[in-house]
Amino acid sequence: MKSKGTRFERDLLVELWKAGFAAIRVAGSGVSPFPCPDIVAGNGRTYLAIEVKMRKELPLYLSADEVEQLVTFARGFGAEAYVALKLPRKKWRFFPVQMLERTEKNFKIDESVYPLGLEIAEVAGKFFQERFGEKV
């Protein structure tokens, strides 16, 4: 499973670069004693701390600690905290942590939250810029 997760992180890196972000994987992000996202990306206007997840189906559950560490890193780095989720045969969807649904002890992305996720172009701001004629 670890190699599959790494492959998805690398796939997302390619998509981020195509969308105009400089992006890197954070090696050992899951085992660091410090808060560490899976990917850090930026395009000069927007900076992202991303926790990468892939699932065969919904819901996706995230521990409160995992979300808290992502938010802690993002605040310290000056980035926006996102969870990027990949489902089979679907595009990457990005969820700002504020969009995650709170459960009794944790967080989740389920069928009601998933359609609200952002596409990579929306996160990059291209949708807004193209709409108003600004070149990207």
Curated annotation (Swiss-Prot):
Residue(s) at site: Transition state stabilizer: K53
Known catalytic reactions: Endonucleolytic cleavage at a junction such as a reciprocal single-stranded crossover between two homologous DNA duplexes (Holliday junction)
The protein's Enzyme Commission number: 3.1.21.10
Function: A structure-specific endonuclease that resolves Holliday junction (HJ) intermediates during genetic recombination. Cleaves 4-way DNA junctions introducing paired nicks in opposing strands, leaving a 5'-terminal phosphate and a 3'-terminal hydroxyl group that are subsequently ligated to produce recombinant products.
Xref: InterPro entries: Hjc, Hjc_arc, Restrct_endonuc-II-like, tRNA_endonuc-like_dom_sf
Note accompanying the cofactor annotation: Binds 1 Mg(2+) ion per subunit.
Pfam families linked to this entry: Hjc
Keywords: DNA damage, DNA recombination, DNA repair, DNA-binding, Endonuclease, Hydrolase, Magnesium, Metal-binding, Nuclease
Gene name of the encoded protein: hjc
Binding site for Mg(2+): E9, D38, E51
Name listed for the protein in its UniProt record: Crossover junction endodeoxyribonuclease Hjc
Organism name: Archaeoglobus fulgidus (strain ATCC 49558 / DSM 4304 / JCM 9628 / NBRC 100126 / VC-16)
GO function terms (MF aspect): crossover junction DNA endonuclease activity; DNA binding; magnesium ion binding
BP GO annotations: DNA recombination; DNA repair
Family in the record: Belongs to the Holliday junction resolvase Hjc family.
Active site: S29
The protein's assembly and partners: Homodimer.
Cofactor: Mg(2+)
SUPFAM superfamilies per UniProt: Restriction endonuclease-like
